[in-house]
């Protein structure tokens, strides 16, 4: 009887096994298309809101997507993305549901125009965030490419 109680206590107190959970992150430029490789991508980081633990991260890469599909609107629940549209794909191991925050910073190739957005959602073990567009964020801002001087150059006073 004592052995059964001990085994029961061990089973109840044993940590849940972590389940691989896929997450896809896409970033739209406000009023425009996906931010992808042509703009240097967008840095993304996933972290646990309660502990601050960084769970995964990387760079959104791919094409800017289908202009007609993105700009033409869509019925509720239909994806904006198409095959090859810019995305970051990762897998995190979750033993329990966690409140996850994604931090997105970009466009990487335009440092003078970089901005950061964050979003939070509960993610369940084994129940990925991949349906349709996955975790879709919108990045506000405007990129202006000055031809002369280039964005990384500075003018001397009086010129």
What spans do the regions from the language model cover?
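Short, compositionally biased P/S/T/A/G/V-rich stretches that sit at domain boundaries
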Residues: 122-159
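N-terminal signal peptide c-region/cleavage motif recognized by signal peptidases
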Residues: 13-15
């Amino acid at each position: 009887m004592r052995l059964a109680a001990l085994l029961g206590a061990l089973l109840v107190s044993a940590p849940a096994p972590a389940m691989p959970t896929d997450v896809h992150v896409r970033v739209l430029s406000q009023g425009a298309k996906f931010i992808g490789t042509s703009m240097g991508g967008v840095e993304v980081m996933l972290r646990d809101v309660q502990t601050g633990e960084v769970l995964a991260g990387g760079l959104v890469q791919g094409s800017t997507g289908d202009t007609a599909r993105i700009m033409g609107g869509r019925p509720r629940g239909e994806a904006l993305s198409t095959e090859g549209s810019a995305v970051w794909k990762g897998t995190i191991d979750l033993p329990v549901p966690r409140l996850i925050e994604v931090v997105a910073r970009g466009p990487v190739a335009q440092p003078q125009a970089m901005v950061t957005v964050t979003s939070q959602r509960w993610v369940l073990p084994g129940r990925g965030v991949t349906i349709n567009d996955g975790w879709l964020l919108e990045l506000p801002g405007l990129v202006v490419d000055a031809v002369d001087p280039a964005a990384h150059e500075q003018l001397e006073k009086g010129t």
